[in-house]
Amino acid sequence: EIGSGLVGSEMCIRDSFTTFEKILWIGSIVLITGSAVMFGKDGILSVIASLIGATSLLLNAKGNPIGQALGVIFSILYAIISFSFAYYGEMITYLGLTGPMALAAFISWIRNPFAKGKAEVKVNHIHRGEVLFMFILAAVVTVVFYFVLDFFNTANLIPSTVSVTTSFLAVYLTFRRNRFFAVAYAANDIVLIILWSLAALTDISYISVVVCFVIFFVNDIYGFVSWSAMRKRQAAEIQP
């Protein structure tokens, strides 16, 4: 069943993008590559991670499970970049939380297609009780990670801790196939733009990472718009 979902995803990737989405992807690639060329150190690794990340976000915006698979790869590369600047919070978050949850989301999305053989996940709605549970769990994770990050003398502790909170909310909602995952990721992008801007004050090469998350922010906003439209369309198609 998972194999057939993958085949469907691969077959539909090329033909499913709108003109706007193609422009968005090409624009993201050009800006990411340009910023990496302009700024030296870690440029190659940053650009590879960013290109994978941008492609992942566009596929996620389409509800395509392949986007989550690319998200696992991005998590590993981003953790390496974070380690280079002693952002242990980011490293631990992406290796211990975002990466594994992206893998879990990949499996969840593959197992819950909107229609058999289609490379589009079924949009899910979560109720108030689960929303409350999610925020309580996020609070617990935040407190635990604060002390862990403090123990490792993490650079810029407060924004690093806030990033853990937004990352957790994002990966939880992604796993649950809820459209607000894109809003949580957009919030996380803002935190990371601030975080890496602080890093860029010390090492200008990290400007390429800042550019990466500005682009991610734009893609995540589009992801929410896309999922909102997808939710309405799926609801209309289900109606008898």
Annotate each predicted stretch with a short phrase.
Residues G63-S108:
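Hydrophobic/aromatic-rich structural module bridging two neighboring secondary-structure elements via a short loop
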Residues L173-P240:
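C-terminal transmembrane-bundle signature of multipass membrane proteins
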Residues E1-G8, C12-I13:
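Single conserved hydrophobic/aromatic residue that forms the stacking wall/gate
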Residues T33-I44, A61-G63, S84:
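Short, hydrophobic transmembrane alpha-helix segments
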Residues L58-L70, Y172-A184:
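Membrane-helix interface "capping/anchor" motifs
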Residues T93-W109, N124-L149, A170:
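Alpha-helical transmembrane segments of multi-pass integral membrane proteins
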Residues V140-T154, T161-F180:
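Alpha-helical transmembrane segments in multipass membrane proteins, preferentially the mid-helix core
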Residues E21-T33, A49, L137-A139:
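Alpha-helical transmembrane segments
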